[in-house]
Amino acid sequence: MAQQRRGGRRRRKVDFIAANHIEYIDYKDTDLLRRFISERGKILPRRVTGTSAKNQRSLTIAIKRARIMGLLAFVSED
């Protein structure tokens, strides 16, 4: 017998930064940056977070700055 596919359309992810009208991503805003970091401390990709390319680039720069300044950890505290 042939197997049937199940499922529907997946919902498009919304850019959190654009939806909340955040114009500048500050490296000191660790609460915002933690939303885009995995449990292991890795930067989440665009396909997971739904951010635009422009916002993803500025997010990456802000996260790296915060890590160097000591505001965010490089790895998880496990």
Curated annotation (Swiss-Prot):
Calcium listed as a keyword: no
GO biological process, one term: translation
Keyword Lipid metabolism: no
Family matches, as InterPro entries: Ribosomal_bS18, Ribosomal_bS18_CS, Ribosomal_bS18_sf
Alphabetically ordered keywords of this record: Ribonucleoprotein, Ribosomal protein, RNA-binding, rRNA-binding
Recorded GO CC terms: cytosolic small ribosomal subunit
Function: Binds as a heterodimer with protein bS6 to the central domain of the 16S rRNA, where it helps stabilize the platform of the 30S subunit.
Family: Belongs to the bacterial ribosomal protein bS18 family.
Subunit structure: Part of the 30S ribosomal subunit. Forms a tight heterodimer with protein bS6.
NCBIfam families cross-referenced by the UniProt entry: S18
HAMAP family named in the record: Ribosomal_bS18 (MF_00270)
Name used for this protein in its record: Small ribosomal subunit protein bS18
Source organism of this protein record: Lactiplantibacillus plantarum (strain ATCC BAA-793 / NCIMB 8826 / WCFS1) (Lactobacillus plantarum)
